[in-house]
Amino acid sequence: MDSASLVQFASALHKHQDSIAGSNTFVMYTVPADAFLQMTEVKMHEELADAGVLTEFDESLGKAMFVSHQWLSATHPDPDFQQLKVLQDTLRNIVAGTSSISQALFSEIVYGRRRGPAPGDFASGHLHIWYDYFSIPQSHGGRASRGRQTAIQSIPTYVARCEFFVVLCPALKHKDQKRTLSHASWGERGWCRTERAARELSTRKGGYVIVVESATHQSLLWGGLSMRDAPGEGEFTLDGDRVWIGRMVTQMVWSKLFYYLEHRQFHNYRFLLNAHAALYFRALDLEPIDGLVPGFHTEIDPSVDCKGFMLERFLHHNGLRNIFERDAAGWPPICFAAMSNNVVVLQALLDRKVDINQATTKPATELTLPAKLTALGIASILRNKEAVELLLRARAQVNYKDGFGGNALHTACGGDNPRGVRLLCDARANVNQQS
């Protein structure tokens, strides 16, 4: 069960307005799909505004589509109208029924087929396109520059208002770099990762994330990518953009944590509270958020028992009543501690004889995580090196089978964690274990 302090705090919260929205949000300009489908060249925001093509999006107009993409040149997003031509043909094909959106192969194998968007959802009469070059001021005047900065800061709000988040990534050559851009290169860009994070952290219910690789090849994005593609570890043309990214991501995480509390989604709150440093803050100059719940008090003197004090604080902010009880989703405290890379709390739990191999009982399907994950498996997939080292020193079982039949070595590979793989192999993880 959840602790009384967590339940009381959630009950006391007033309706929390999204902290990334508000009076400073730039207008959400979109292009109606009817006008978009008639385009033969990419014109910038100011030209479209002067021509009366842009609309101020409102949900009463229909559904919006956020287009995330890489620019095909240093000065223009799509100089030869190649990228957007693919999106035009994609929309026409889906509506005509000559192309359909497939599910990510791995999630379909594991969890079965799920409902995707219907062709009618893309009917041009009620679809509106958000695209950076259309929707954000591009000129160099002072007013446009201020508007551009505000619009960029408003991207999480735009993403949250869009039913569709489209990764537009056909294989096309960059005009200046002479390399081919693709879905893989999109995933390497820091800003693209931030836009993806904005979708994951939005408070919107429903919607779809669609990868468009050609006019006849579209698929739903696999959720497992978020476990290894932190925004700060992406590539940036300007390293100073990391400061912008840090502010945006911090606001998004705070907003989502409060959303989970307001809606009493306490497991999701714990998951994000403990995982956000690895998933979203890594490689950014940010301090992790270590708690929101007020009213912490304990009789433990931190100068006498630092580990015990930190353990009590951890339990309080996670809304856990004791060190042995699982939450409603089947996750024990030791797994949350491993997720946050909190080695002080991990050691305190081990000192109190908590089972080091205690595993989750339910899967996290939205992130394609299986049931029966141990603290070692969780620390491995999140690349929490210090937690992995501590758990291995404490003799965690390296070949414990998770719900997919794999071990911590499999999760380390899934998290793109070469250091973890090396540590686990040194600890004699079974490289031949089959899932």
What are these regions (language model features)?
Residues 1-344, 348-349, 358, 378:
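The feature represents the membrane-entry module of six-transmembrane cation channels
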Residues 152, 418-421:
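A general structural signal for well-ordered alpha-helical packing
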Residues 314-322, 347-355, 362, 389-397, ...:
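Ankyrin repeat domain, specifically the short helix-to-loop turn at the C-terminus of the second helix
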Residues 324-333, 359-375, 401-407, 434-435:
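Ankyrin-repeat boundary/"N-cap" motif
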Residues 357, 370, 377-381, 390-394, ...:
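Extended amphipathic alpha-helical coiled-coil/heptad-repeat regions
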